[in-house]
Amino acid sequence: MENPHSILKKVFGYDSFRPGQEEIVSRLLAGQDVLAVMPTGAGKSICYQVPALLLPGITIVVSPLVSLMKDQVGALVQAGVAAAFLNNSLTDNQKALMLRRAREGWYKIIYGAPERLEMPGFQRFAQEKLISMVTVDEAHCISQWGQDFRPSYLRIKEFVETLPKRPVIGAFTATATAHVRDDIRSHLDLHDPYEVITSFDRPNLYFGTRRALPSEKPRVLLDLVLKERDNAGIIYCSTTKQVDETTRLLQSRGIRAAAYHAKLDPETRRKNQDDFLYDRVQIMVATNAFGMGIDKPNVRFVIHYNMPKDLESYYQEAGRAGRDGEPARCTLLYSGTDVRTIRFFIDKEMEADNGLPADVKAEAARKAEERLKYMTFYSTTPRCLRSFLLNYFGETAAPRCGNCSNCRMSEQAAEEMQQQ
């Protein structure tokens, strides 16, 4: 008889669960809702894929990213799991075929964008079949306090309420403050959930901030990259134009770099991603479109060429460094111009015709401004950066870590004082 360990070994090829995974699997199999906040690279997908293969009915995985769905479904199918996805990358004929097969019981796991839950055809299928579990990936998208608020996530609860039998619900995210966790519990109507909040601390990561005028950033960036020699790294930029310019700058110095952003055609994006994953290029220069679901353990540095919009985004992106547990460096370059750029995007979001009421959009903008304020504080604080980050996410931390630019600077100043 199959059990979590036999599925883990047979389907996924692992001998044992990582810390925290097995308890989540057990709770979901026992019918208890779960809210899991686990850092990038902690193996969240195993936590719901294993029970999905042991529960009697079908599991629906709600995911916001087309590329992530494709990658995860591709890996499952390769492992012999009957899985499929439903999103806008499919033609109408492909969607109809997928739904017909779903009604015929072809699939064990179905990934879908939250908007797909509202399709009449999808709702008919869900009401005809036994839906044992609904998994919500990137669950922070349900909260206006989260960094990627998606109004369509708010309708997941309504979808669950239309099902003949309430499924167990698993909500997963890499970063969630107390505000966001409250929203996830409330908006998904989680019933007495088992909660896992893994420590956000990544002791192997060095955190650094550097103030630099826009005209100085290319020089500062080259200094940082050249110190890394042949190490693999990711450079995040806030605009596609900046990605292209930075990629050309690095290539002009003989550095093997590739670009990744939404304006590149899918084939180029896939090729550049594979070149980076298989070490054919040293550096990926990207917008925040790059990284979700990418597991490259040997990334030795992540540089943010521009300040991100909030600490949730920053920590998730910086956390793609050092997944092998070896030392890695995370450096943020910032200037006043970065803040103006982020405010421009916040205003643009306010003006967008996305069907949201004006008061909801105004509240979302207010919360985005609040998150930007903390991001700016992080960029300019003289405090220990690790302590600042951990406190923001609700953890207590030692006042000094000794492994960030501010701690190193104060140590250096103390040494100089002693020598005088």
Predicted segment positions?
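C-terminal accessory/connector segments of nucleic-acid motor ATPases
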Residues: 352-420
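Helicase motor core with emphasis on the C-terminal RecA-like subdomain
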Residues: 2-11, 15-19, 23-45, 52-55, ...
